[in-house]
Amino acid sequence: MSGVSNNKVARMLERSLVAALLATGLALVMVPVAKAGQIIPSVGWTKTPDGDGETAVSYGLALRGGIVPMVDAELGFSYRKEKLFDNQVESTQWPVTASVWVTPTPMFYVGGGLGWYNTTLHYPNTPALASYTSQKTGVHLGGGITMPLVPGVASADLNLRYVYLGEEKSELPPANFKADYWTTSLGIAFSF
């Protein structure tokens, strides 16, 4: 009888070992998938040609993830408010962007994308009706650097991009002005 129970124990140990090896293999395969995306809250600084030399602060949130090796896709949302033309015009913008970034190394990325830019121009000291809202599609080009803070968990993300929107037209003065701008953002990319 002890030979039969030894065979059962040996078979149970063998099955346990195979199950442990399969679980370990599955865990090793799933680790890259589990960290496939990042959520990136950020603060940015924007410089517009008609911003009176001022730098506007913006706030953003992005989701970024790999789509194929060395290529990441990103969806982003941001918000900024600034004064233009000697404080005569208050501009509020909330762009929604989609970007593709080529990552030749894990630390650097370059690329660009498209965005939907909702812009409201308000004229202070006038009725609330004295505002003009427009929606434009624009393109952006840029790049960035990521530096690990806590490997596999969080990294610092520094991004620079040029946004091309062309001429902004308003029914209120100024009738036309250049809407392009440079923006730099610093964020923390949290992996999930």
Language model features: what each stretch is:
Residues 36-53:
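Short N-terminal segments immediately surrounding and downstream of signal-peptide cleavage
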Residues 62-158, 162-164, 184-190:
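Gram-negative (and chloroplast) outer-membrane scaffold detector with strong preference
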Residues 3-6, 17, 156, 186, ...:
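Compositionally biased regions
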Residues 44-46, 124-129, 169-171:
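Extracytoplasmic loops and strand-loop junctions of Gram-negative outer membrane beta-barrel proteins
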Residues 174-182:
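Individual transmembrane alpha-helices with interfacial aromatic-anchor signatures
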Residues 48-56, 85-89:
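Solvent-exposed loop/turn segments connecting transmembrane beta-strands
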Residues 58-60:
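Short catalytic helix/loop segments, enriched in acidic residues and glycine
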Residues 1-38:
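Cleavable N-terminal export/targeting peptides
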